[in-house]
UniProtKB/Swiss-Prot annotation:
Topology with respect to the bilayer: Multi-pass membrane protein
Name of the gene: PFA5
The UniProt record lists the keyword ATP-binding: no
Enzyme category, top tier: transferase
Annotated ranges, domain DHHC: 239-289
InterPro entries: Palmitoyltrfase_DHHC (IPR001594), PFA4/ZDH16/20/ERF2-like (IPR039859)
EC number: 2.3.1.225
Domain comment (free text): The DHHC domain is required for palmitoyltransferase activity.
MF terms in GO: protein-cysteine S-palmitoyltransferase activity
Name assigned to this protein: Palmitoyltransferase PFA5
Entry keyword set: Acyltransferase, Lipoprotein, Membrane, Palmitate, Transferase, Transmembrane, Transmembrane helix
Family membership: Belongs to the DHHC palmitoyltransferase family. PFA5 subfamily.
Transmembrane segments: 114-134, 148-168, 279-299, 320-340
Entry PTM: Autopalmitoylated.
C-alpha cells in the first residue's frame, strides 16, 4: 500500500505548524523503498526568508505532518538548503493532465474537432473578401485609392494576428491546462474500477456517488484549514464532491460534461473546444475582443465598398453581400460575448454564479482559539478529533495509525501532538445574505485579478490570470470587504478587538 508522507525540518516548524502541506520534499513510501517523487508539472510555490537565520549545527529530527491513517515511515528530506539562498516550498496542487482534455459526450467531442476547421474556412473567406477583392481589386486597381487600401490591409493584419494568437493560446490552454482539480488516490482507483467494469460490461453508475470523507486526516482537508477563510458547509467542513471523491476548493464546480471539478468554471465553449475556466478566461476575453474588432473591420470595409458602388451606379457583387452578412453575424455575437465576459470580470463572477445570483455562501472565518459558538454562529476547531473520540484533550493528536508500542512511533505521535497543539485553529461559520459576493474586491482589483497587472497583459495573451496562483496564506481567492462586514454583523469584530486588548494588557 502506498501513502504520501509530507515531512519538514523542526527548525521550520513555525510555518509547517500552520501549513503542513507545504514541504521541502515529498516522498512515497512503498514496500520499505523510498522513492523521491519528481516535481509536478504545475505548482503553486512561494519563497521563505533566508533560512540561514534559522539553521542550527545540530538540526532536530524531522517532524511528521498529518497525511493519512496508514503506518508511515519518517524520511529526512534529501534536499539541503544553502545558507545564502531562500528555500522554496511547493504546495502540491498540480494539474496532472497528460493529454488533451476530452468531453464524455461524443457529440461535444466531434463539434470541438470540427469547429476549428469551420472557423479556418470563415477566416480564409474573410481574407479573400477584404484583402484580395476589396483592397487590391477594387480600391487599388479599379478606383485608385491606394492609401485607403494600405491602411485597411495594415489594420486587417494586426487584428488578424492578435485574434489568431489569442485563439491558439486559449485553445491550447483549454486542452492541456484545463483547470481541473487534481484527483485524489481514491478517485483514481474508482476511475480505474469504473473503466474495468465498463470494459467487462458491468454497472458503472454504482460508482458515481461517494459520501463525504469522515477521516480527520482526510487527504486535502488540511489545505483548507491552513487558510484563514474558506467556503464551507453548515457543519464547517469544506464542500465535498461525491463524484470526484474530494474536497472542493473555493469557487470550484463539477462539470458533468467532463466528469471533473474545475477551478472557477465559467462555461463549456464548443468554439474553443472545451471548458472556459480560470486558466483560460483572460485569453477567451482577448479572443472575443479581437474577433469583434476583426468583424467590425470586415463589415466597415464591405459597407464602404457597397456605398461607393451604389453611388457610382454599379451593381453590388454577391461576395460583398456574403462578407457583409457573415461579418455582421459573427461581429454581433463577438461583441455580445465580450461585453458579457467583461461584466463578469468587473463583478468578479462567472457564468455559474450568474445562474445562482440569489445563492448564499457559508464562510469559515478564522477566529481566536477558544471562541465558542453563540446563538448567531457556530464554531469548529481543526484538526478534527477522530469519530467517537470525545475523551481526547483539545488540540491533542491521535495516533494517526502509528503503533504506540514502537519507540519511533511514540516519538512521532508526540511530535504530532505538539504540532497539533500549535496548529489548532478555530473557525466561525458565517453566512452571507442572498446575492452577496464575498469575492468582490472593487472593480479595478476584480479586473486585475483576471486580466493581469500591466496593460501588456490586458491586450496580449502572455500570462495566466493572477487569480490562478492560489499562493496566499489567507484564502484561495482574495476575499473582499464583505468578510470584515460579516465579522461586524455577527459581533466578531468587537470580540477580536477585546481579546487583542486583553493580550496586550497581560503582556
Amino acid at each position: 500500500m502506498t501513502v504520501d508522507v509530507l515531512v519538514a525540518r523542526s527548525d521550520e516548524l513555525d510555518l509547517a505548524s500552520n501549513t503542513s502541506d507545504t514541504t521541502i520534499n515529498a516522498t512515497v513510501v512503498k514496500d520499505e523503498t523510498i522513492i523521491t517523487r519528481p516535481p509536478p508539472t504545475l505548482t503553486r510555490s512561494w519563497s521563505l526568508p533566508n533560512a540561514s537565520t534559522r539553521r542550527t549545527d545540530n538540526p532536530a529530527p524531522p517532524v511528521l505532518t498529518r497525511a493519512s491513517s496508514l503506518p508511515v515511515k519518517l524520511v529526512e528530506p534529501a534536499t539541503d538548503i544553502d545558507s545564502d539562498s531562500s528555500s522554496v516550498w511547493t504546495w502540491a496542487w498540480s494539474d496532472e493532465m497528460q493529454g488533451p482534455a476530452t468531453s464524455k459526450r461524443c457529440g461535444t467531442r466531434w463539434i470541438a474537432r470540427l469547429l476549428p476547421f469551420f472557423m479556418l474556412m470563415l477566416v480564409g473567406y474573410a481574407t479573400y473578401d477584404v484583402v484580395v477583392y476589396c483592397c487590391v481589386e477594387y480600391f487599388i486597381q479599379e478606383i485608385r485609392k491606394t492609401a485607403t487600401a494600405i491602411v485597411l490591409i495594415v489594420f486587417y493584419t494586426i487584428f488578424f494576428i492578435l485574434m489568431v494568437a489569442a485563439y491558439i493560446r486559449c485553445y491550447v490552454t483549454i486542452q492541456f491546462n484545463t483547470g481541473f482539480v487534481p484527483w485524489t488516490a481514491a478517485r483514481e482507483a474508482a476511475e480505474s474500477e469504473r473503466n474495468e467494469r465498463s470494459t467487462n460490461g458491468g454497472d458503472v453508475e454504482s460508482l458515481q456517488w461517494s459520501p463525504a470523507d469522515t477521516n480527520p486526516d482526510s487527504p486535502g482537508l488540511e489545505a483548507f484549514y491552513s487558510k484563514d477563510v474558506f467556503i464551507c458547509e453548515s457543519d464547517g467542513l469544506p464542500k465535498w464532491c461525491s463524484e470526484c471523491r474530494s474536497w472542493k476548493p473555493d469557487r470550484a464546480h463539477h462539470s458533468s460534461e467532463y466528469g471533473r471539478c474545475v477551478y472557477k468554471m465559467d462555461h463549456v465553449c464548443p468554439w474553443m473546444g472545451g471548458i472556459i475556466s480560470e486558466t483560460s478566461f483572460n485569453f477567451f476575453i482577448q479572443f472575443t475582443f479581437y474577433c469583434a474588432c476583426y468583424c467590425v473591420l470586415i463589415v466597415s470595409t464591405n459597407a464602404y465598398v457597397v456605398t461607393l458602388r451604389r453611388n457610382a451606379g454599379q451593381s453590388v457583387e454577391g461576395r460583398v453581400v456574403v462578407g457583409l452578412a457573415l461579418g455582421s453575424l459573427f461581429g454581433l455575437f463577438s461583441i455580445a460575448m465580450t461585453v458579457t465576459a467583461l461584466r463578469f470580470v468587473f463583478q468578479n463572477i462567472t457564468n455559474v454564479d450568474l445562474f445562482r445570483k440569489n445563492q448564499t455562501f457559508r464562510l469559515a472565518v478564522r477566529v481566536p482559539t477558544g471562541t465558542r459558538s453563540t446563538d448567531q454562529f457556530t464554531t469548529i476547531t481543526y484538526p478534527l478529533s477522530p469519530p467517537g473520540d470525545d475523551s481526547r484533550a483539545p488540540g491533542t493528536a491521535h495516533s494517526n495509525g502509528v503503533d504506540q508500542s514502537d519507540g519511533a512511533g511514540s516519538i512521532a505521535t508526540n511530535r504530532m501532538a505538539a504540532r497539533d497543539q500549535r496548529a489548532k485553529r478555530t473557525f466561525a461559520i458565517l453566512q452571507t445574505q442572498s446575492g452577496e459576493n464575498p469575492w468582490h474586491v472593487g472593480y479595478r482589483n476584480n479586473f486585475k485579478s483576471v486580466m493581469g497587472e500591466t496593460i501588456f497583459e490586458w491586450f496580449l495573451p502572455l500570462r495566466h490570470s493572477p487569480c490562478t496562483r492560489h499562493d496566499s496564506m489567507v484564502s484561495d481567492y482574495e476575499f473582499g470587504p464583505l468578510v470584515e462586514e460579516l465579522k461586524r454583523r455577527y459581533g466578531l469584530a468587537e470580540e477580536d478587538a477585546e481579546k487583542g486588548a486583553n493580550e496586550t494588557t497581560s503582556s
